[in-house]
Amino acid sequence: GAMVQARSASQNSPFQPGDTDIANNPYNGGTHLPDVTAITPVFIAVDSASGSGKENQPLFFVASRGHHADIGGITPGSMPPNSTQLEQEGGLLDNFKLIDQGELRQEALRQHLATATYPVRNPDQNIADLQAQVAANNKGAQELHRMVQQFGLATVQAYMQHVQNNAEQAVRRVIQQLYQQHGQSPLVCQVPMDCGASIQVSITIASENQALSATIDFTGTSDQQPNNFNAPLAVCKAAVLYVFRTLVDTPIPLNAGCLKPLSIVVPDGCLLNPSFPAAVVAGNVETSQAVTDSLYGALGVLAASQGTMNNFTFGNQQYQYYETICGGSGAGPTFSGTDAVQTHMTNSRLTDPEILEM
């Protein structure tokens, strides 16, 4: 994902076996600060099939993302409605070394979280959640080692490439269908937002060397806003990936291959590609829904959903609660819309009601 790519491209010291970094920087592959990604490299000997060789470089990465109930900021739950600067939304983790060659840097993390302009309210909870994410990564790494041991490195890598190639071809078939329906005429949609901004998108199909591709151009979208409805670039790209994946009628794993036939144009400094340190917390949960609606509207396949994530949050220094409330989904050419469901960005389950009773 975007966070792994950002870490790989960073100037940080190279990964070592046993390392895990954590990151939530919206301007470096992230979404908003409560979403913290743990990234663990997987080192496998190049000739591991024969049982010899040295582990000198990571061949795979495993990652897990968790939405933390609180990461600091001016309100409990780290979803302030009136933030205007990123620091008001919580503590920044920009490829922080959580585990250094097997050693958990718990005190260093605690100090880092405490020195934010608006510190986290319950660091023990954050640390416990991060340990759970690390455990998930470790399980993923174990399964990768098991696969390589059973099938061999070359076979595993070949199938990983096949999964991406298959996803690319599946999306190209979707583009072919769009081309047959609309030709090369731009598919355009504009979605106004309650904050006064608007999202403009134009989707154009092109043919080069008998291969079809699509350009998704957000030129004309409003400039970044003084509020927190700005959406980081990764959020916009994720919405494009999501929409085109839903148009594929075969069960394929979601992966980067889906993006290969797609060219995404997002002007610098606009609502969907803001400049640091603009606030972004609502961009991930509100603007992302509007981006999705604009894409479905341009393609003519789905009416708009409720267009919001309906965030509900409260708390104090001891407890923090965060919930999303469901709404309606749009109709399509051959089916009706629905009510009281989670749509698009959320697709989440309800929190146990016992949490409210605490």
Set out the residue ranges of the language-model regions.
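Glycine/proline-enriched, intrinsically flexible loops and inter-domain linkers
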Residues: 1-47, 53, 57-358
